[in-house]
Swiss-Prot record:
Regulation: Activated by host HSP70 and HSP40 in vitro to be able to bind the epsilon loop of the pgRNA. Because deletion of the RNase H region renders the protein partly chaperone-independent, the chaperones may be needed indirectly to relieve occlusion of the RNA-binding site by this domain. Inhibited by several reverse-transcriptase inhibitors: Lamivudine, Adefovir and Entecavir.
Name of this protein: Protein P
Miscellaneous information on this protein: Hepadnaviral virions contain probably just one P protein molecule per particle.
InterPro entries assigned to the protein according to its UniProt record, in alphabetical order: DNA/RNA_pol_sf, DNApol_viral_C, DNApol_viral_N, HBV_DPOL, Rev_trsase/Diguanyl_cyclase, RT_dom, Viral_Replic_Matur_Polypro
Keyword Protein transport among UniProt keywords: no
Lineage summary: Viruses, Riboviria, Pararnavirae, Artverviricota, Revtraviricetes
Chain residue ranges for the region called Spacer: 178-345
Function as written in the Swiss-Prot or TrEMBL entry: Multifunctional enzyme that converts the viral RNA genome into dsDNA in viral cytoplasmic capsids. This enzyme displays a DNA polymerase activity that can copy either DNA or RNA templates, and a ribonuclease H (RNase H) activity that cleaves the RNA strand of RNA-DNA heteroduplexes in a partially processive 3'- to 5'-endonucleasic mode. Neo-synthesized pregenomic RNA (pgRNA) are encapsidated together with the P protein, and reverse-transcribed inside the nucleocapsid.
């Protein structure tokens, strides 16, 4: 007969009918009892021939691929012009005085951030945009390309111009200015001969207004040649030939599209974004577009006498000028030929765009190192898209990078720190990752991009192949024409207009700010925000500021005080260049919602949406059916988050952990499901630890236990010898049960850790409930007053130690610590508290 739920509760000592704890609790460590209970509850994981269940509620397991949903109406989020103040340490010191060593070290880590992978694998451009949505390939291509363009315009990406130069938008940093090669320009007044000197260096420097000007007589690193003669049309801005002092008319920079022969003498060749694979590196691709240089003052400056009518120049263009514009001169192949689309506009705009600033970069191949694709911004916002960057090559294989570890505040640390009767609000940092600048030397390792529409479509279509590798073009221009492509492009034309042409060209971009797809980024963001919050805490010692990643919370004793603090802190953060989203500032009152918890003066509980997820999970959980271990992983992830708020905690989930480790199916018996259900439907807050003086001590030997409760000494023996850790845990349980003390001294590190998952299952569950809310203090064995009673010597009295317990915030980064805020609530349960049931010894 299977074990009933009520009988199981009695075995676990969760009911009041249990006998004396000193007799009942040691039985739970018995191997035979644990084995019999596991058999009765079907926890032994026998090999079952019944087919596994691969879906439970929202959890899917093996062999069930979730089809991602593409939204053709995704909006690309707008990104502010984020420019973190370069001299951020001095700005902070002006605000708060000298910074600590820890704060300086962390701020220096991100100004600029550096990235040193062991090795970098370069992938072909076709893998730049992942075919994540097979039914919406073209739409996804343009949406992703638009997202990348938006990031570049906002100054978060570099655009690779040539092998050794890149352009970007936004304000430059000093480490980027240092990479400029040659003299600076000073607006439109010096756009004549000196402008071409700059182009001859292959850098195309364009600094902002007011930047320092080097003397035009000063020698650049290129030597005097580049400043003594104007740039001829045949001279190419290729860094390799410039260093050699030779300008070859036959060698052109890879990825450059020079204009046709009619303009060859008028325009200096400039890098464009027509980037193909290495097989075509030496091929020249004529550029059709009219170049307009925008000076730092914002005026368009046309070079020499170039016609501004792109239509006129396009008609005399060679055959390989631009894949998109070739359709203009070709005969339509069908009703769905792209010629119809291209002829809708006279002026499709330039083939490529260039940033405001051009810098030298380390040698960067025409490849990508990671793929990108779009997903919903979050489960609650499906109208906007989010760019997912896959740089997983740096986290896999023999050359994987060991990312630095950093402290994640655990539940008890968070509760100790934030559980008070303060009034709270949380700040929303806009695009937090894109605040932290990367050194340009990291660009060759963090490359994203696309191969251009023609190659992308050809790669994904079954009847089109890229045969002419020499020119990287299709053997027949109209091979790519199809009804699906035509319809998709016509619909996209309404959204993107003439940008369809720009986005159809190849492009390679490197990250200028830290990307989200690299394990280094969370570490850097955590260091940065923790240092900033430390500065805020020192500036406002009567308040509390805390952050985890981009989640920043402020606490003050009154709402009026909090609003004043909010204004001051916001102004300080804005002065550093940190962008906040005021529309997403949330005022929480006295119950803070943070990291999935609700934290108030009574302690912490999971947020309501997590509780609802757990209820939904139990409603869908089948009994007596083997469930795929992959599904169990999802269930354990959800239940594990709320485990500290239950009676038996993590030990109750150990059968599921075991099944996942052995990659076996797990079958829920009705009793085990009812047990877990009861556990998770009654959640108890995790309370804030309070400082105190330890008056109760416990110790044990394999054969006996001893307690020291004030001046009282107790001892007892076990029926059979037990492992020492098990004996020490039993002694701690007896001390808690007999004294009711929430502070116990012990010399056992396993008991101190409060992790009871390695003990016999029944004992771990019962001990977790008995010791819930108990704090432990380490006492050396030689000084432990309970040491003698545990060895059977009651007559010897060692003096009680004055051991003070101070609640800790763990390894959480708190350099400037706010004074603790005493709770004004009495120790008894407040009428508004969700804590309805106080702990009773079993």
């Amino acid at each position: 007969m299977p074990l009933s739920y009520q009988h199981f509760r009695r075995i676990l000592l969760l009911d009041e009918e249990a006998g004396p704890l000193e007799e009942e609790l040691p039985r739970l460590a018995d191997e035979d009892l644990n084995r019999r209970v596991a058999e009765d509850l079907n926890l032994q994981l026998p090999n079952v021939s019944i087919p596994w269940t691969h879906k439970v509620g929202n959890f899917t397991g093996l062999y069930s691929s979730t089809i991602p949903v593409f939204n053709p109406n995704w909006k690309t989020p707008s990104f502010p012009d984020i420019h973190l103040h370069q001299d951020i340490i001095n700005k902070c010191e002006q605000f708060v005085g000298p910074l600590t060593v820890n704060e300086k070290r962390r701020l220096n880590l991100v100004m600029p951030a550096r990235f040193f992978p062991i090795s970098t694998k370069y992938l072909p451009l076709e893998k730049g945009i992942k075919p994540y949505y097979p039914d919406n390939v073209v739409n996804h291509y343009f949406q992703t390309r638009h997202y990348l363009h938006t990031l570049w315009k906002a100054g978060h990406l570099y655009k690779r111009e040539t092998t050794r130069s890149a352009s970007f938008c936004g304000s430059p940093y000093s480490w980027e200015q240092e990479l400029h090669h040659g003299a600076f320009l000073d607006g439109p007044s010096r756009m004549g001969e000196e402008y071409f000197h700059h182009q001859s260096s292959g850098i195309f420097s364009r600094p902002p207004v007011g930047s320092s000007i080097q003397s035009k007589h000063q020698k650049s690193r290129l030597g005097p040649q580049s400043q003594q003669r104007p740039l001829d049309g045949s001279q190419q801005g290729r860094s390799g030939s410039l260093r050699a002092g030779v300008h070859s008319p036959t060698r052109r920079p890879f990825g450059v599209e020079p204009s046709g022969s009619r303009h060859a003498k008028n325009i200096a060749s400039r890098p464009a974004s027509c980037l193909h694979q290495s097989a075509v590196r030496k091929a020249a691709y004529p550029n059709h577009s009219t170049f307009e240089r925008h000076s730092s003052s914002g005026h368009a400056v046309e070079l020499h006498n170039i016609s501004s009518s792109s239509a006129g120049s396009q008609s005399k263009r060679p055959v390989f000028s631009c894949w998109w514009l070739q359709f203009r001169n070709s005969e339509p192949c069908s009703d769905y030929c792209l010629t119809h689309l291209v002829n809708l506009l006279e002026d499709w705009g330039p083939c490529t765009e260039h940033g405001k600033h051009h810098i030298r970069i380390p040698r960067t191949p025409a490849r990508v190192t990671g793929g990108v694709f779009l997903v919903d911004k979050n489960p609650h916002n499906t109208a906007e898209s989010r760019l997912v960057v896959d740089f997983s090559q740096f986290s896999r294989g023999s050359s994987r990078v060991s990312w630095p570890k950093f402290a994640v505040p655990n539940l008890q640390s968070l509760t100790n720190l934030l559980s008070s009767n303060l009034s709270w609000l949380s700040l929303d940092v806009s695009a937090a990752f894109y605040h932290l600048p990367l050194h340009p030397a990291a660009m060759p390792h963090l490359l994203v991009g696309s191969s251009g529409l023609s190659r992308y479509v050809a790669r994904l279509s079954s009847n089109s192949r890229i045969i002419n590798h020499q020119h990287g073009t299709l053997p027949n221009l109209h091979d790519s024409c199809s009804r699906n492509l035509y319809v998709s492009l016509m619909l996209l034309f309404k959204t993107f207009g003439r940008k369809l042409h720009l986005y159809s060209h190849p492009i390679i971009m490197g990250f200028r700010k830290i990307p989200m797809g690299v394990g280094l980024s969370p570490f850097l963001l955590a260091q940065f925000t923790s240092a900033i919050c430390s500065v805020v805490r020192r500036a406002f010692p009567h308040c509390l500021a805390f952050s985890y990643m981009d989640d920043v919370v402020l606490g003050a004793k009154s709402v009026r005080h909090l609003e004043s603090l909010y204004t001051s802190v916001t102004n300080f953060l804005l002065s550093l260049g940190i962008h906040l989203n005021p529309n997403k500032t949330k005022r929480w009152g006295y119950s803070l919602n943070f990291m999935g918890y609700v934290i108030g003066s009574w302690g912490s509980l999971p947020q309501e949406h997590i509780i609802q997820k757990i209820k939904h999970c139990f409603g869908k959980l089948p009994v007596n059916r083997p469930i795929d271990w992959k599904v169990c992983q999802g269930i354990v992830g959800l239940l594990g988050f709320a485990a500290p708020f239950t009676q038996c905690g993590y030990p109750a989930l150990m059968p599921l952990y075991t099944c996942i480790q052995s990659k076996q199916a797990f079958t829920f018996s009705p009793t085990y499901k009812a047990f877990l259900c009861k556990q998770y439907l009654n959640l108890y807050p995790v309370a804030r630890q309070r400082p105190g003086l330890c008056q109760v001590f416990a110790d044990a030997t394999p054969t006996g236990w001893g307690l020291a409760i004030g001046i009282q000494r107790m001892r007892g023996t076990f029926v059979a010898p037990l492992p020492i850790h098990t004996a020490e845990l039993l002694a701690a349980c007896f001390a808690r049960s007999r004294s009711g003390a929430k502070l116990i001294g012990t010399d056992n590190s396993v008991v101190l850790s409060r992790k009871y998952t390695s003990f016999p299952w029944l004992l771990g569950c019962a001990a977790n409930w008995i010791l819930r809310g108990t704090s432990f203090v380490y006492v050396p064995s030689a000084l432990n007053p309970a040491d003698d009673p545990s060895r059977g010597r009651l007559g010897i009295f060692r003096p009680l130690l004055r051991l003070r317990f101070r609640p800790t915030t763990g390894r959480t980064s708190l350099y400037a610590v706010s004074p603790s805020v005493p709770s004004h609530l009495p120790d008894r349960v407040h009428f508004a508290s969700p804590l309805h049931v106080a702990w009773r010894p079993p």
